[in-house]
């Protein structure tokens, strides 16, 4: 009898998912026709060309205001940054976070947690030597791991390395790559990422296609029917249990630190947060509690691991596609760095390498709409009144592909960031980290990681594809609201520098 009920539940669940697939299409309001299934950002770009810089679409039953183009985005998220600073919530996100953490919160909670997170990163050396040394240490472990392979899909190795940089900030130490707890953490944090970028986990090294065939529609269904989903059996129960296991580990680590806490010298994010908790323990309105600490640590992992590792994977894919560009980068590395360990200070002396990394991020367009915002009050914008709580998407891809800002927006061309003298040239349209009050708080860390990992690996290795360059597809995969690199295997050969 129990087995029959379970099968009935599963059949009903599948029926709901099939219906959901039809309901979740972005619908063009004026004509009532479903948009092309080429990814939400691509579809929104087409609408912006038709309806202008501000328009509304519906995602299922949810109205969403889209802001497109550099000028309109700047007006909204810089000039009216406070009004547009809220974070839109989804039921699945709220179930995982309960509204805690810097990424999903709004108002006072978000401001307090963001200020504390930025100060902690600064104190631990974001842009200074200490974090730089942690990254340099991790590049050595990655280089040793690469030496063990011939043909390889590099995504798991790269993801482990970036995850360990975050681990050193959160926990004060790195893990061995095969450490069971580290692998649990690496499995779990993309789960939070996927709630923002459906399909992202489909390409993650730790999950199978079969797993994703469930989770992709599940997250969508959960957002529409959060109370109903709990009545059905399935992998989602196991998923939430695993997530809670990782969260429990973080809390346990914090409680261990509390026993021997040196309040004058915090060694990691958890200790810095504990000190803040002790300082404000008598404040009934404090936002510094265990729940916010755990979810803020989660946010650093989920936002910092997959994004940076995906960008690095795209970088090496571009080098395989364009071996002449790879050769120029390696020559600049040889001329400026030689055989010593790369440092952040080298970047200003390496305009071509810097331009290549900027162009990879522009071309890839990892987060075309960022994490969805909401307006925190009724807001007038471009002669429209946007009601409080309305979801807002900044269409950053409309800026990164603007021909008025980039001379070759549809091609991979490092010249977009070089002047006529070969010097690095900044561009206001370079917005891969967002804009305004909710700009990525780990931007400086990500820039440091990208430069040091990229130069360290190309200093020692040459990347080549398992097929000719002209057959390599470098176009990122559309993944609902985001873009991710093509999955690939490659040859990583040790360089012989004369």
PLM features per residue range, with description:
Residues 323-325, 443-483:
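Cytochrome P450 heme-binding "Cys pocket" and the immediately downstream C-terminal segment
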Residues 27-36, 40-134, 153-154, 158-165, ...:
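Cytochrome P450 substrate-recognition site 1
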Residues 122-126, 198-202, 214-218, 239-312, ...:
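Conserved cytochrome P450 catalytic core segment spanning the I/J/K helices
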Residues 394-421:
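Conserved cytochrome P450 K-helix/beta-meander segment immediately N-terminal to the heme-binding cysteine loop
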Residues 2-21, 58-65, 125-137, 146-168, ...:
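Cytochrome P450
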Residues 382, 420-450, 475-479:
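Cytochrome P450 heme-thiolate "Cys pocket" and heme-binding signature region
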């Amino acid at each position: 009898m129990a087995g029959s009920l379970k099968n009935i539940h599963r059949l009903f669940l599948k029926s709901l998912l099939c219906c959901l697939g039809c309901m979740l299409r972005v619908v063009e309001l004026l004509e009532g026709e479903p948009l092309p299934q080429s990814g939400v950002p691509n579809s929104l770009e087409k609408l912006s060309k038709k309806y202008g810089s501000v328009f509304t679409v519906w995602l299922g039953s949810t109205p969403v205001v889209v802001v497109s183009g550099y000028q309109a985005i700047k007006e909204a998220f810089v000039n009216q940054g406070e009004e547009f600073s809220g974070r839109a919530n989804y039921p699945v996100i709220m179930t995982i976070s309960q509204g805690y953490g810097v990424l999903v919160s709004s108002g006072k909670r978000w401001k307090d947690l963001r200020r504390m997170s930025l100060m902690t990163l600064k104190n631990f050396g974001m842009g200074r030597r200490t974090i730089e040394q942690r990254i340099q240490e991790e590049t050595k472990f990655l280089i040793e791991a690469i030496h063990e392979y011939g043909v390889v899909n590099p995504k798991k190795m790269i993801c482990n390395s970036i995850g360990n940089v975050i681990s050193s900030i959160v926990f004060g130490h790195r893990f061995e790559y095969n450490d069971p707890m580290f692998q649990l953490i690496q499995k779990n944090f993309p789960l939070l990422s996927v709630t923002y970028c459906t399909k992202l986990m489909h390409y993650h090294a730790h999950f199978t296609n079969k797993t994703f065939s469930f989770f992709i529609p599940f997250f969508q269904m959960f957002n529409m029917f959060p109370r109903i989903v709990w009545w059905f059996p399935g992998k989602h129960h196991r998923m939430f249990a695993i997530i809670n296991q990782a969260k429990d580990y973080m809390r346990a680590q914090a409680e261990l630190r509390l026993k021997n806490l040196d309040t004058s010298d915090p060694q990691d994010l958890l200790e810095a947060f504990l000190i803040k908790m002790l300082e404000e323990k008598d404040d009934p309105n404090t936002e510094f509690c265990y729940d916010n600490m755990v979810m803020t640590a989660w946010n650093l992992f989920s936002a910092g691991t997959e994004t940076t590792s995906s960008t690095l994977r795209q970088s090496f894919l571009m080098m395989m596609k364009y071996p002449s560009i790879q050769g120029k980068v390696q020559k600049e590395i040889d001329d400026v760095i030689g055989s010593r360990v790369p440092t952040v200070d080298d970047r200003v002396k390496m305009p071509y390498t810097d331009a290549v990394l900027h162009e990879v991020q522009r071309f890839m367009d990892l987060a075309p709409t960022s994490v969805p915002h909401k307006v925190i009050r009724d807001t007038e914008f471009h002669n429209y009144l946007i009601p409080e709580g309305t979801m807002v998407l900044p269409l950053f891809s409309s800026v990164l592909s603007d021909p008025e800002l980039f001379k070759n927006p549809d091609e991979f061309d490092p010249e977009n960031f070089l002047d006529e003298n070969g010097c690095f040239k900044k561009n206001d349209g370079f917005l891969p980290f967002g804009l305004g009050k909710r700009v990525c708080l780990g931007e400086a860390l990500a820039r440091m990681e990208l430069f040091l990992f990229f130069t360290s690996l190309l200093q020692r290795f040459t990347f080549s594809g398992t097929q000719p360059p002209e057959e390599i597809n470098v176009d990122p995969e559309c993944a609902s609201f985001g873009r991710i690199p093509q999955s690939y295997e490659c040859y990583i050969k040790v360089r012989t520098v004369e």
